[in-house]
Amino acid sequence: MEFSELFKKRRSCRAFKDIPVTQEQLQAITEAGQWAPSPLNQQPFQFIAITDPDVKAKVQKSGIEAKQFVADNGGPGWAKKYSMNFVGECPLIMVVVYDPENGGLGNYFDQPHGALQSTSACIQNMMLMAADLGLGSLWFTFFNPASLKQVLDIPEKLDVAGAVMIGTPAMEAKAPPRKAPKIHQNQYQ
């Protein structure tokens, strides 16, 4: 597939077929992530591949608790109706963690986010590779990071960038319309 079509093919997927992701697919997806740019080539990201139904249920529970907290504390109205079923049903959950101290410039120039930025590029690469392999994916962030870290025994010094749901899509997702790019010439106008 041409790259110009690949990024348009990638859609957020919340319905998956009960087909396992193969080790070859997992390897290709994580390798694509590993090739993401990072400050000083520090590659601050690591992956937790979750296929065990009991562990997926714990991740799902973390999402349900976050959803309830948001709904109970005046969050957007859609939060109460948001279904978390896909979390337990997707064949593979890739939790992507990173070391916030490996971000290049660190706190110089008030730019402490290099590690998160490169981990975001890593996740995008993973999702593009999944699409290239005919898999669907979803970058999921609707969870309490502290709860998820506890559930997965993630060391305190690491942060969670997201949980990427990956599997064979149960249906084709339609692309929502995109806004026109806002391009400023030479300075912000």
Q: Could you describe each region identified by the protein language model?
A:
Residues M1-P20, E24, A28:
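Short acidic N-proximal helix/loop "leader" segments that mark the beginning
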Residues F3-C13, A161-Q189:
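C-terminal helix-cap and adjacent tail motif
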Residues I29, G33, M94, G104, ...:
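Small-aliphatic-rich amphipathic alpha-helix that forms the alpha element of a beta-alpha
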Residues P37-L40:
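Glycine-rich phosphate/pyrophosphate-binding beta-alpha loops
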Residues Q43-T119:
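Glycine/small-residue-rich phosphate/adenosyl-binding loop
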Residues Y98, F142, T168:
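Short secondary-structure boundary segments
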Residues P100, F143, G162:
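Residue-level "edge-of-site" marker
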Residues L148-V160:
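Short, electropositive alpha-helical surface patch
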